[in-house]
């Protein structure tokens, strides 16, 4: 069959033809055609199973299904089973690769799972095995030698200290957007000129006395970079509600859910500590909305890098 399912209208037509045949011939048909007039058909046993699953669905959900599978779909294969090791030796990996290739050659298709050891036992899904092969080939290309081991699933990268320390103060976050939300709820702004506070001290002051835009940029840049984003500090002038221009610093961030890294830096997403803590503006908006002038990148004569 070209498809493993039929829509509900086709199934009910099959059911009607099955009942008509039984009534007319006093027996069940050996096969049931998918469509009236001939063509593709299924055995009686398969059709009975379709009827059973159709009735089960109606009893359970109080409505008809939109489709009925000819044969029930196979359950999803877990990525790894509970006994699967964290990694395999290069010898073991190459044995898995050999068995995978042999299966393809013999059966004309890929296996649903690849066993870690010949003869059964722990296994990985086809998708996981393909990822193992991709990482093996990348290592080979980059290092011009085979790895000693291949991880079944890649290990989590170590969390940078700056991210760990920020999570200790603000709580859990995984993205720059989530971090911005936490900053808007927990942190404070304090006006003063230039950068005056080392990062370790600023980490404490941001939730007590408050810090300014310069110290905030120096504090949050390595944190957001540690989450996997590209970050630059932009030096600007902003015009506020009093129509005066003020010097200001904020972050431009790209990657993941924010602006694309392929865009020029001046089009990356604005991540402004003062917007979050003082003026209550959303992520992507600078603290003042009456005007903005770009002055440069990075902090002028920083005291605390």
Swiss-Prot record:
pH dependence: Optimum pH is 6.4.
Group of enzyme by EC: hydrolase
GO molecular function: peptidase activity
One Pfam assignment: PMBR
Domain of life: Viruses
Residue numbers annotated as active site: 213, 248, 272
InterPro entries cross-referenced by the UniProt entry: Peptidase_C71, Pseudomurein-binding_repeat
EC numbers, comma separated: 3.4.22.-
Sequence segments annotated as region (Pseudomurein-binding repeat): 3-34, 39-70, 87-116, 121-152
Required co-factors: Ca(2+)
GO process terms (BP): defense response to bacterium; killing of cells of another organism; proteolysis
Binding note for cofactor: Activated by Ca(2+).
Temperature dependence comment: Optimum temperature is 71 degrees Celsius.
Keywords: Antimicrobial, Bacteriolytic enzyme, Cytolysis, Host cell lysis by virus, Hydrolase, Protease, Viral release from host cell
Family statement drawn from the similarity comment of this UniProt entry: Belongs to the Psimunavirus Pseudomurein endoisopeptidase family.
Subunit structure: Monomer.
Note: PsiM2 is a defective prophage of methanothermobacter marbuggensis.
Function: Cysteine protease that cleaves the cell wall of its host methanogen under hydrogen limitation of the latter (autolysis). Cleaves the epsilon-Ala-Lys isopeptide bond in the oligopeptides of pseudomurein.
This protein's domain notes: The N-terminus contains a cell wall binding domain. The endoisopeptidase domain is at the C-terminus.
Name of the protein this chain belongs to: Pseudomurein endoisopeptidase
Organism: Methanobacterium phage psiM2 (PsiM2)
Gene from which this protein is expressed: peiP
């Amino acid at each position: 069959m070209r498809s493993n399912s039929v829509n509900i209208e086709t199934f009910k037509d099959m059911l009607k033809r099955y009942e008509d045949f039984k009534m007319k011939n006093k027996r069940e048909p050996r096969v049931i055609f998918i469509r009236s007039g001939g063509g593709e058909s299924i055995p009686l046993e398969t059709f009975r199973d379709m009827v059973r699953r159709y009735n089960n669905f109606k009893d359970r959900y109080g409505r008809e299904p939109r489709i009925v599978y000819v044969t029930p779909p196979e359950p999803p294969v877990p990525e790894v089973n509970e006994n699967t090791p964290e990694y395999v030796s290069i010898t073991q990996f190459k044995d898995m690769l050999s068995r995978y290739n042999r299966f393809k050659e013999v059966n004309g298709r890929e296996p649903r799972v690849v066993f870690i050891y010949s003869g059964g036992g722990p296994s990985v899904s086809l998708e996981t095995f393909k990822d193992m092969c991709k990482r093996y080939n990348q290592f080979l290309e980059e290092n011009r030698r085979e790895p000693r081991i291949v991880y079944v699933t890649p290990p989590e990268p170590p969390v940078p200290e700056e991210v760990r320390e920020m999570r200790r103060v603000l709580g859990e976050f995984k993205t720059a957007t989530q971090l911005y939300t936490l900053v808007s709820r927990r942190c404070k702004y304090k006006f003063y000129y230039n950068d005056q506070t080392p990062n370790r001290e600023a980490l404490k002051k941001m939730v007590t006395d408050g810090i300014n835009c310069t110290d905030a940029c120096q504090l949050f840049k390595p944190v957001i970079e540690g989450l996997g984003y590209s970050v630059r500090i932009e030096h600007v002038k902003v015009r506020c509600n009093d129509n005066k221009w003020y010097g200001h610093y904020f972050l431009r961030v790209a990657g993941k859910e924010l602006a694309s890294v392929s865009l020029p830096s001046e089009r990356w997403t604005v991540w402004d500590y003062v917007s979050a803590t003082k003026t209550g503006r959303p992520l992507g908006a600078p603290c003042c909305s009456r005007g903005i002038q770009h002055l440069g990148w990075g902090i002028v004569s920083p005291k605390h890098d």
